[in-house]
Amino acid sequence: MLSNISDEELTPIKIYTDPIILNNINLEKFFDKKDIELSIINKKNLKITDKGLYSISKYYDAQWITDRVIDFLKNKNIDPLDVNIIDGTAGIGGNSINFSKYFSKVLSIEINNIHYEVLKNNIDALNIHNIQIYLANFLNIIDSIKDDSNIFFFDPPWGGNCYKNFKYFNLKIGKLEINDVINILYDKNIKYTILKAPHNLNLSTLYSNIKYENMIVHRNIKQSMILIIFY
């Protein structure tokens, strides 16, 4: 039973190493073919890292996420073209690039220097002008940008593939439990928080410990889900 599983069993420990930019990778597994062709036309190269191989939202997953968010907003009579969205864990740009095609503006935040440079490169390679990027921990700058958007998306690290070894999985950002991070966003008056998580996220623990009243769960066939959490 879940009550007999300790936090240590639920949350893997992984030693962090900096990402490495890779060459000679088949980018069609990760980016939309049209985006790859556009980067070639622009005489620039999309880039990916070793961590990006498993952490990026591949273009079809990114599209699925965007579609779910747009459906949610339209049900609330909100036009996504009038909306700015924050991507708090932008990585190398999988979700941010897709969001830029449907939202007015994307505020993309990345904490890692190498991924920030790859993110900047990929945005430039596609000649995207409605993404504003920040090199920062989103918790440190949310106060300065929250007036630009009350929709916050994030995809915290899953610890590589080791999440698959757990029946129930607890996400963390640094030392903070994911419910604590979500409650910080609530306290910052973020109206809509969207979380990408592995399929085995410990939902009961999460829901019982967040301040938001509502949560919609969407599952896809790629071992992941998104949670739309709101007032």
Question: Language model features by range: what are they?
Answer:
Residues I56-N140:
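SAM cofactor-binding core of SAM-dependent methyltransferases
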Residues Y54, L139-I142, N220-Q223:
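A short acidic, often aromatic-flanked loop/helix-cap motif at beta-alpha or helix-coil junctions
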Residues N4-N42, L185-Y186, I190-Y231:
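C-terminal catalytic and target-recognition region of SAM-dependent MTase-like enzymes
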Residues M1-N84:
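S-adenosyl-L-methionine
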Residues I145-N214, H218:
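S-adenosylmethionine
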Residues I13, L81-V83, S104, D147-N150, ...:
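Short coil/turn segments at beta-strand junctions that form active-site/ligand-binding loops
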Residues I36, S96, I141-D143, I182-I184:
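Short, flexible, glycine/charge-rich loop motifs used to bind or transfer phosphoryl groups or to couple energy/partner
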Residues N4, N127-N130, N150:
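Generic short N-terminal amphipathic or hydrophobic helices
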